[in-house]
């Protein structure tokens, strides 16, 4: 049935777009299943883990069909089925032995086979030239990363999407200079990992020493920023910002966080026996006015705790998933995220850089945090505390994490992804059914009200890489509302992220956007501000070439598993 027929028969919500329906049809809907049938399947399965299952099924279904709660891709694909797992990604911790290195390769393969994007921490593996048993010398971490690079490609063959993994290394590691460049298509092909993403873990001590003038560190920092400007990576993981903000239960049990996931929003403990699990879904901020006084964050906590329970049940006895299952049982960490932040601001004619945006930013994320904390306490009393929460009156070590949500934003109504500014006001969205020109719906309404919603106007916007700053029909206030991501002062992105971080117990996927001619000093200052203001990580660095109005907004390097 076509979407219009499904809507007329009550089998699809009115807010579902053609592009969103086609996205769902490509791998989320079961054979013969309608969108509302999928929402019912997911709701019913989640509710089955509670005593009053009919009540919770209806609560979950209502939240989803109202377009308030937006489950992640793996939840829609696999919840209530026997075909896969409903979680988004994992991260593994590699020990300094051949046994651990290859044992974790098997774990990586099994996690990838089951649909997860995988983070890989290599910080414990000795560097190049270090002594090994038998009087030999280590070749360093890069050849082992190459093993994982091959595993990701091999295990995903025949899949609907390629596997995805990101390797992380501390900046103090002796192999760091080579590691920075493992994705550059130059040099020895055997020491390049073109199928892996990569991130660097940086301590406060290192940053302070670099800023105080250490020449070697300054050179390394320059190389990192150059690599980010050129390739978008490496991701940055600020080790002390992460661990200083750990929840009290983590601090009491001395559970350090070494690494993140492939989208840099998950910050959970790992060691060789514990691999973390990303259990994600998002709240739709574009509809904040509808649910701000409702119990939606409470519902989301209960929903995701059930999703995690389904993962625990399904993963029992599955080879390679033992470490992830162990972590899920002990901590029950979940990650409530958001989407539609910029869509919400534009619908209310609020500029991204404004004081009003900051005020709402604080109100929204404090509300989500407070209600989520309330519900995890209720669940602890109802279902008990897991091992890592004993004595803390909570069901989950962590509750919130802001994933990228690119796919989720598309199939949930075509809103802006996560807390990110819109990259372009018009772009081409590619799908299996063809290429569709996607226009910013809020801008389209504004132009219509001005009598300027014409093909010529949209062609001119496309010719300006999605910008409206050249339009004489818009006043300065309207132009400020519709600034694109690279036109916005990047300090505004950092300031908003820093402000909301106090109410987010995990982290945020924060992309930065720069024009090709951006002053290197400006790029440096924005990155330093992220660290100084307490951000836990930085995701991609987007140069102007990536953000074109005539290109799809999603990069091939982004992981659909983790898009919350």
Predicted segments, located by residue:
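Gly-rich Lys/Arg/Thr-decorated short loops/hinges at beta-loop-alpha junctions or inter-strand turns
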Residues: 82-89, 127-134, 474-483, 505-509
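Internal maturation/activation junctions in enzymes
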Residues: 105, 299-325, 329, 333, ...
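Function-dense linear segments that define catalytic or interfacial modules
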Residues: 27-33, 42-52, 61-86, 90-133, ...
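Conserved, charged catalytic cores of large soluble enzymes
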Residues: 1-51, 57, 134-147, 158-255, ...
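Secondary-structure capping and boundary motifs in well-ordered enzyme cores
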Residues: 16, 34-35, 56, 81-83, ...
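Flexible, glycine/charged-enriched surface loops at secondary-structure junctions
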Residues: 52-60, 117-120, 159-166, 311-325, ...
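Structural signal for hydrophobic packing residues in well-ordered secondary-structure cores
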Residues: 28, 43-50, 61-68, 106-113, ...
């Amino acid at each position: 049935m076509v979407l219009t027929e499904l809507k007329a028969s009550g089998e699809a919500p009115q807010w579902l777009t053609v592009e969103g329906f086609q996205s769902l049809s490509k791998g989320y809907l079961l054979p013969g299943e309608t969108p509302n049938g999928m929402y019912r399947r997911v709701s019913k399965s989640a509710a089955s883990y509670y005593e009053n299952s009919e009540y919770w099924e209806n609560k979950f279904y209502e939240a989803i069909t109202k377009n308030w709660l937006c489950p992640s891709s793996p939840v829609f694909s696999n919840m209530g089925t026997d075909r896969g797992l409903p979680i988004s990604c994992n991260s593994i911790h590699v020990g300094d032995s051949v046994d651990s290195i290859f044992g974790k390769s098997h774990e990586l393969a099994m996690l990838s086979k089951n649909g997860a994007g995988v983070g890989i921490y290599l910080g414990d593996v000795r560097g190049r030239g270090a002594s090994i048993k038998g009087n030999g010398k280590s070749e360093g971490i890069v050849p082992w990363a190459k093993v994982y690079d091959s595993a990701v490609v091999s295990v995903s063959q025949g899949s609907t999407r390629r596997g995805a993994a990101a390797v992380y290394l501390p900046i103090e590691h002796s192999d760091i200079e080579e590691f920075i460049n493992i994705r550059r298509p130059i040099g020895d092909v055997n020491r390049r990992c073109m199928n892996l993403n990569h991130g660097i873990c940086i301590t406060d001590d290192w940053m302070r020493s670099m800023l105080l003038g250490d020449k070697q560190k300054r050179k390394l920092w320059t190389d990192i920023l150059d690599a980010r400007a050129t390739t978008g990576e490496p991701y940055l993981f600020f080790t002390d910002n992460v661990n200083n903000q750990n929840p009290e239960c983590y601090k009491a049990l001395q559970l350090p966080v070494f690494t993140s996931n492939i989208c840099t929003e998950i910050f959970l403990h790992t060691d060789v026996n514990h691999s973390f699990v990303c259990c994600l879904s998002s709240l739709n901020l574009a509809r904040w006015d509808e649910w701000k006084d409702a119990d939606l964050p409470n519902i989301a906590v209960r929903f995701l705790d059930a999703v995690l329970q389904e993962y625990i049940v399904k993963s029992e006895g599955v080879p390679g998933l033992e470490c992830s299952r162990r972590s899920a049982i002990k901590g029950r960490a979940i990650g409530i995220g958001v989407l539609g932040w910029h869509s919400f601001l534009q619908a209310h004619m609020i500029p991204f850089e404004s004081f009003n945006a900051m005020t709402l930013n604080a109100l929204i994320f404090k509300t989500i945090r407070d209600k989520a904390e309330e519900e995890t306490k209720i669940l602890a009393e109802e279902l008990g505390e897991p091992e890592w929460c004993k004595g803390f009156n909570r069901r989950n070590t962590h509750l919130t994490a802001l994933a990228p949500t690119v796919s989720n934003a598309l199939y949930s109504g075509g809103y802006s992804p996560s807390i990110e500014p819109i990259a372009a006001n018009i772009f081409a969205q590619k799908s299996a059914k063809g290429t569709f020109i996607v226009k910013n719906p809020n801008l389209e309404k504004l132009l219509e009200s001005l009598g300027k919603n014409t093909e010529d106007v949209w062609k001119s916007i496309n010719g300006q890489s999605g910008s409206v700053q050249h339009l004489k029909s818009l006043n300065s206030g309207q132009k400020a509302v519709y600034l694109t991501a690279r036109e916005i002062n990047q300090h505004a992105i950092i300031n908003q992220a820093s402000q909301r971080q106090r109410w987010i117990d995990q982290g945020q996927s924060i992309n930065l956007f720069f024009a090709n001619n951006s002053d290197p000093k400006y790029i440096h200052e924005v990155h330093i501000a992220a660290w100084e203001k307490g951000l836990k990580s930085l995701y991609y660095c987007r140069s102007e070439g990536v953000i074109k109005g005539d290109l799809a907004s999603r990069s091939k390097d982004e992981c659909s598993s983790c898009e919350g």
